[in-house]
Amino acid sequence: MRLTAIFFMAMQATITAVAQTMNVQTGQVIYSIPSDQAGDMIYTSGTELTILDKTFDISQINKISLDESNVKANTVDVTYNGNSAQVRVPYNLMSYLTVNANNGHVSIIQDDRVTEEITYTLSGSSNDGSFYMDGELKATIVLNGLTLNNPDSAAINIRDGKRIALILTDGTTNTLSDGKNGSQKACLAVKGHTEIDGNGTLNITGNTAHAFWGKEYLQLKKGAGTFNILGAVGDGINVNQYYQQNGGIVNITGVGDDGIQVSFKTDDNDQTIPLSEDEDNTGEVLIKGGTLTATVTAAAAKALKAEGPVTINEEKATTLITLKATGGVTVSGTDISGSAALKSDSQILIDAGTLTLTATGQGGRAINSDGAITINGGKLTARAEGSNYGSSGRGGGGWGPGGGGWGGGSSTSVHKYAKGVKADGIITINGGDMNIYSANHEGLESKTEILISGGTVYVKASDDAVNCSVGDSNTATGNLTISGGTVYAYSTSNDGLDANGNMYVKGGVAIAFGGSGAETGIDIDERHAMTITGGQIFGIGGRVDGSFSGCTQSYGYSSSSTRCSSNSGYFVLSQGSTRLFAVKVPTSFSGVVLVSSPSMQKGTSYSIASYTSVSGTETNGFIASPTVSGNASNSVSITGR
């Protein structure tokens, strides 16, 4: 004992004289104390050594060494090596952290006396390791070339409920995976709110549930690197409060449920916490920059799903979003759910960005909103390529687009239609460039109203290309208003533009190609009317449907027995040798025509003919004041009304 006391006195004298760092190792934990911070070391009863309020049991000390390493306050280093891990704790945290390291598994509990943010740097590799941290103050987790697999539970589990900054060291690749059949919520689980930054790469695989889970919000900073979800039994990313992406690259594939799911945070009784108590609890997706790519394959899965609103813009950086859902439907009695590339239980706002959204599963939708959809800008491609799902309670027949529903007098009990863009609320388009396609049902549909004042909107669908409908077929309403922009609506077997309420054209361009027979280019319900006060209109289909009321701009249409046809090229509206406009023909087409233009006059004769050679500035299939060459074919005369 006397020799031990002499040793510690000599050690203290040495580090003070030489300005070195003393490292006290107990098991897999090393406590580093610079000479200028050591102060008095108190040796008590031959069994304890106290340094800076940290008391060591001498029997538990494996080694004390001196070196010239620099010690950074408030920074803990965890280095994994095979089935082991070494934890280095700085002098100022020795009495504030409870550290346990068992082989490759590390647990650190912060004392509630901690007043400054602690940084934990994780590096190295382990096939049987984990990191657990809990505390009551915000913290930073730095991943510096970490490969970590926990065969039993989460690879990283942060129970600290405050802000957690997750830093991906520039240029590093970090890979996390967890075990199968566990009870963990995710491979990487964070109780607090997570903010990801740093230009590194993070790969996560969730073998029990989600890949990433956050009880509170997840935010990717503008300088964030690459975040790859390589697989998950559940969701790729599952968070509460909100998801915000200001930059970085997020790739999600191989998941068993949704790509990203954002929910409202709930209390211990599973009740949603109101905004008055938690201003962050919006259930919202905010994408202000960066790249997001997600593919989901499960039945009824959504590539991006929010219980709250979805807002997409380029406020922070260029935004590129590619979402794909390939799964079919899930059915429970009369409750049916389909897949979607983008789904909001609230509303969707798109101000900017390039979005490519695809649904290929049965009954799938590219965009599905329980509320409104507003598009002010950006470039949107939305495709529903799957078939419709339907079953009937009795009778024969089956669903067919454009056929008005179920054949054989059957009653529909369960169905899900594959649609390009669908909203229960109002669809408002003020700008942007849209290309929407539906292989087997409506392209752009609102269950309330559609308002278009700008942008270019191209829609191709087997059923109605653009449809507004509120209520059942006997009492349906739903107004469609076009006051600007260029709308090109092409239905292969039903109506191009279909308003079950009133249709108002006040400006812009409205082009509509409809099916044959009873289908029309522009369809107005017989109980309502079309009002034309401006704009350029071209509609062609099996007939001209509906009535006209309150029109202040001249219009005209051909009779049911007078048809305009074209194998290719353009339909051109002319008054003598003056060409008013030209409309590109999507395919070989023949039908009854409805036209209107500010240049038309009541009682004046006009012609519509097919030309193969037309020049001029073309926008979404429309050319104003075109130049034509060659001979006209299939000319039809109409009179302005």
Feature locations, PLM:
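Sec-dependent N-terminal signal peptides
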Residues: 3-13
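Generic alpha-helical secondary structure signal
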Residues: 11-12, 47, 84, 610
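Sec/Tat signal peptide C-region and signal peptidase I cleavage site
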Residues: 14-19
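Compositionally biased alpha-helical segments
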Residues: 20-70
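A composition-driven surface/loop motif
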Residues: 67-641
